[in-house]
Amino acid sequence: MMAETLTPRQIVEKLDQFIVGQKEAKKAVAIALRNRYRRSLLDEKLRDEVMPKNILMIGPTGVGKTEIARRLAKLVGAPFIKVEATKFTEVGYVGRDVESMVRDLVETSVRLVKERKMNEVKDRAEQQANKRLVELLVPGKPKQTIKNPLELLFGGQGAQADNSYSHEDEQVEQKRRQVAWQLANGQLENEMVTIEIEEQTPLWFDFLQGAGIEQMGMNMQDALSSLMPKRRKKRRLKVSEARKVLINEEAQKLIDMDEVTQEAVRLAEQSGIIFIDEIDKIARSGAVSGSADVSREGVQRDILPIVEGSTVMTKYGPVKTDHILFIAAGAFHMAKPSDLIPELQGRFPIRVELAKLSVDDFVRILVEPNNALIKQYQALLATEGISLEFSDDAIRKIAEVAFEVNQTTDNIGARRLHTILEKLLEDLLFEAPDIGIDKVVITPQYVEQKLGSIVKNKDLSEFIL
């Protein structure tokens, strides 16, 4: 089944493979994604009228807000970027302008489309790359250069040269056929070959990027570098590495960049997802007032037309933001969603609250997802020939430790598990190459021994866990 035609229930099931709990948030993004598919089936007049319902996620850090949006985008191959609201400044101040988020989205979209197009021509590119490798491994005799152009007219030495090469050419062709066969059978992968590649030289105006020049809606580096001659340098590589470089070069020749650009802009406009994190940090807090609040409100007012739907100039042309899906997120500890300016509140009609993680959630996070942390450590130690196992009681003990440290210090959600597991397995990871055993079982006693004293000492746990 194509990703675009997944039902909301199927989307939630896919997200469940990576994220534990948070059913309401998953349900909201699944409906938003399905609505995009429904909109694509409408006739053109009505299609333009149906706008995406942007989502505001409310919940503490580490509960899955970003991961839900990122996995959703990956699921359907949509261009996705995450930006932090605090990085933007009001127009006229030093810092990034809000339109840069749309430009970044288009860049991501171009990269996605280009990668897909290059994969489509990969077989042809590989054939061309192998031909070039054969020519590099068995170079032909250099063609004789004619110093005097009149020799071409009067059939001098230049005309005689063609016949003298025929026997040598035959030998070269025979040798190349043999080398091509060896290449196809992987017999020359470690042979060294010299290839010419384009040199990536940093230009003097790189520092201008990010200093306000991006507001011109064009990439100055591209404009100026196109006027300068391309420099090539020679590199000596193994055949296996040279093939990758040559495949990339040949694939670039086979794709039409104008077509890539048009498709990328269309993809960004119709399927793009922009995740705006820490939006609560630019809300007017009831406790604080002053110039900082004015600045935050200015950023909100700058974000408003982008979310409402406007046209942003990029180096790939104008991009309409009307149908881009915006997902904003924040913890809202110091502020409330109602502290955002009313116009911006109205542009995020769907609000979902993500729950804090319980001990049971931590247990599930450790073992259930496809990329669960315990599975990652087991795979890492398997490379050293060690089978790592956790008893059920040990997993629960780890979850309890994570929950307790979150309660007594800063609550960083599931990210706490990374710190705790790294501390728990620190000695084992250090000694693994020399330990000389093939199986390790983590028990509750081992967890207590490694982490117990740190957890009990609040000051120590603040620094270590």
Swiss-Prot record:
Please state where this protein is localized. Answer: Cytoplasm
One Pfam assignment: AAA
SUPFAM superfamilies tied to this protein = P-loop containing nucleoside triphosphate hydrolases
Its gene?
hslU
Its keywords, alphabetically, are: ATP-binding, Chaperone, Cytoplasm, Nucleotide-binding
Question: InterPro entries, per this entry?
Answer: AAA+_ATPase, ATP-dep_Clp_protease_ClpX, ATPase_AAA_core, Clp_ATPase_C, HslU, P-loop_NTPase
Its assembly, as annotated, is: A double ring-shaped homohexamer of HslV is capped on each side by a ring-shaped HslU homohexamer. The assembly of the HslU/HslV complex is dependent on binding of ATP.
Mind listing the GO biological process terms from this record? Answer: protein unfolding; proteolysis involved in protein catabolic process
Tell me the classification of the organism that encodes this protein.
Bacteria, Bacillati, Bacillota, Bacilli, Bacillales
Listed GO cellular component terms?
Answer: HslUV protease complex
Instruction: State where ATP binds.
Output: V20, G62, V63, G64, K65, T66, E67, D277, E343, R415
This protein's major location comes to: cytoplasm
Q: What is this protein called?
A: ATP-dependent protease ATPase subunit HslU
Query: What is stated as this protein's family in its record?
Result: Belongs to the ClpX chaperone family. HslU subfamily.
Function, as annotated, reads:
ATPase subunit of a proteasome-like degradation complex; this subunit has chaperone activity. The binding of ATP and its subsequent hydrolysis by HslU are essential for unfolding of protein substrates subsequently hydrolyzed by HslV. HslU recognizes the N-terminal part of its protein substrates and unfolds these before they are guided to HslV for hydrolysis.
Citing just one GO molecular function, the answer is: ATP hydrolysis activity
